[in-house]
Amino acid sequence: MMAVDIEYRYNCMAPSLRQERFAFKISPKPSKPLRPCIQLSSKNEASGMVAPAVQEKKVKKRVSFADNQGLALTMVKVFSEFDDPLDMPFNITELLDNIVSLTTAESESFVLDFSQPSADYLDFRNRLQADHVCLENCVLKDKAIAGTVKVQNLAFEKTVKIRMTFDTWKSYTDFPCQYVKDTYAGSDRDTFSFDISLPEKIQSYERMEFAVYYECNGQTYWDSNRGKNYRIIRAELKSTQGMTKPHSGPDLGISFDQFGSPRCSYGLFPEWPSYLGYEKLGPYY
């Protein structure tokens, strides 16, 4: 078909048919040009950078337990004893026993609560001259108390004993002293020694005290530390001595401690200087 024939047929059509058939080919001219939905800045375009992609929505976290996955909630491990013992640098049990024993030893340690009589020689000599007997020195070692006693040589036959209580004079025991040969012959003084073991268990509320007595020619002479006795107290109580004043009641020949127990000495908690112990034991002269 030639172009002339097409043009002829188009011209022969009615005007209404021509507009209806080819109406879709006529479109209105837009008033404004369309803009792109994404625009790059001039800086990004110049540098060649690409705009970042849109961030995806975060996935919400979920918590799931082991039992939901078919697993156990607990894990049990069983340890069996080794066939060969471990080579430890020290024995833990022995170390703990040592710590406990040290703590117990500190709480049960005792100290002398009086000064050494022979430390003041002039006073010691005057006491010996007046009372004919006097404790010379004393020391505490390994749950035992040991010391020496000086007496005037009034006769050949003589007896020296330590009267000691471990329960605040509810009961007492007499321990004989042993004669010590004097270095210098012909002295008018004799020396006796004693060594007394302390009980394993002593109640904390009880007091240990002792006095010295000397029997000669049917007479008995006492050294009771001027009526106060020689006391042995626990180490932790040493710092608290002197807090209680001595008893100021009438002199009836007997006194009572703070628990109401009778004692053969006078006064309560007098102030005495402390003594840690002598390394050597022996006569003063």
Curated annotation (Swiss-Prot):
Disulfide bonds: none
Phosphoserine: residues carrying this PTM: S261
Short motif (PP1-binding motif): ranges: 62-65
InterPro entries in alphabetical order: CBM21_dom, CBM21_dom_sf, Pase-1_reg-su_3B/C/D_met, PP1_3B, PP1_regulatory_subunit_3
Summary of the tissues where the protein is detected: Highly expressed in the liver and, at lower levels, in skeletal muscle, including in vastus lateralis, gastrocnemius and soleus (at protein level). Highest mRNA levels are observed in skeletal muscle, and only moderate levels in liver and heart. Weak expression in placenta and lung.
Entry keyword Phosphoprotein: yes
GO biological process: glycogen metabolic process; negative regulation of glycogen catabolic process; positive regulation of glycogen biosynthetic process; regulation of glycogen biosynthetic process
GO molecular function (one): protein phosphatase 1 binding
Signal peptide residue numbers: none
Gene3D superfamilies: Carbohydrate binding type-21 domain (2.60.40.2440)
UniProt domain CBM21: residue ranges: 125-233
One cellular-component annotation, GO: glycogen granule
Keyword hit for Transcription: no
Keywords: Carbohydrate metabolism, Glycogen metabolism, Phosphoprotein
Assembly and oligomerization: Interacts with glycogen, PPP1CC catalytic subunit of PP1 and PYGL. Associates with glycogen particles. Forms complexes with debranching enzyme, glycogen phosphorylase, glycogen synthase and phosphorylase kinase which is necessary for its regulation of PP1 activity.
The protein's role, per its UniProt record: Acts as a glycogen-targeting subunit for phosphatase PP1. Facilitates interaction of the PP1 with enzymes of the glycogen metabolism and regulates its activity. Suppresses the rate at which PP1 dephosphorylates (inactivates) glycogen phosphorylase and enhances the rate at which it activates glycogen synthase and therefore limits glycogen breakdown. Its activity is inhibited by PYGL, resulting in inhibition of the glycogen synthase and glycogen phosphorylase phosphatase activities of PP1. Dramatically increases basal and insulin-stimulated glycogen synthesis upon overexpression in hepatocytes.
Swiss-Prot/TrEMBL domain comment: The N-terminal region is required for binding to PP1, the central region is required for binding to glycogen and the C-terminal region is required for binding to PYGL.
Name used for this protein in its record: Protein phosphatase 1 regulatory subunit 3B
Gene: PPP1R3B
